[in-house]
């Protein structure tokens, strides 16, 4: 976590301050350290989401925010000065867009673990703007089921109206739940399935601080597998018409994707450690059963905090 660096960057955005509403959502805090830090930034609002889980926090942000466009990032991210301007420009250029994602580059590559994360795929999705949309009658799952290609939750923005129309984030997904991820992937899919456009805008750039040690990297890679397959299960359960596409994607991911990476780990064991591939593979199988458990957990959390708005 480097919240101070994140907020310093947001304070330096090349965008009119009176048009910005910056909110820090403190998720299930155990102390007042975040509140104390945020108090140093007069233009930043602080709020608490007592229910543990990243998607609960995102939903709190949706309720608290005042703008027509809501941009999300994380506390281990430093936004480029032109981040918000590029997001706003992409929405203006694409009136049918309900989501804009952006380029995520490493803030540093100082350790072997950070270099390995980039070699494994990282968060970067290229340097060309792309617009994705599903035509009427097309299967969103068949065409764009692998939504990780569009970006990541560390750099995504939505029109507020989309949440009013299609609902907020699923609190059974992502960090702080048994699924450990998938909330961003599921929302990208929801955007495309609704018929709206999703824009990848590389000019909307942020820098992410990757895990510095190998054990943390291995855990992250395993959680990627858990989160991705939890997203597939959730999508298959929610949209029966997409079930076959999700099954096909899951089978392809388990066999072709992982077998190819295992082969690379044999050819280049130092550059591409096999235990990272196996960690993601184990996580993928684990993810097949995690979503149901996470739904029960989210329901329990909702009952314990039933006075909180959903």
Which role fits each region the language model picked out?
Residues 7-48:
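Acidic donor-binding segment of Leloir-type glycosyltransferases
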Residues 33-35, 49-65:
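Glycine-rich, basic loop-to-helix element that forms the pyrophosphate-binding segment
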Residues 70:
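Short aromatic/hydrophobic "clamp" motif used to bind/position activated sugar donors
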Residues 74-78:
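The conserved acidic donor/metal-binding loop of glycosyltransferases
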Residues 82-123:
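Conserved donor NDP-sugar-binding/catalytic core segment of glycosyltransferases
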Residues 121-148:
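Short, flexible, basic/aromatic active-site loop/helix in glycosyltransferases
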Residues 149-167, 172-204:
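A short, conserved alpha-helix in the catalytic core of glycosyltransferases
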Residues 220-226, 240-310:
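Non-catalytic, C-terminal membrane-associated alpha-helical segments of glycosyltransferases
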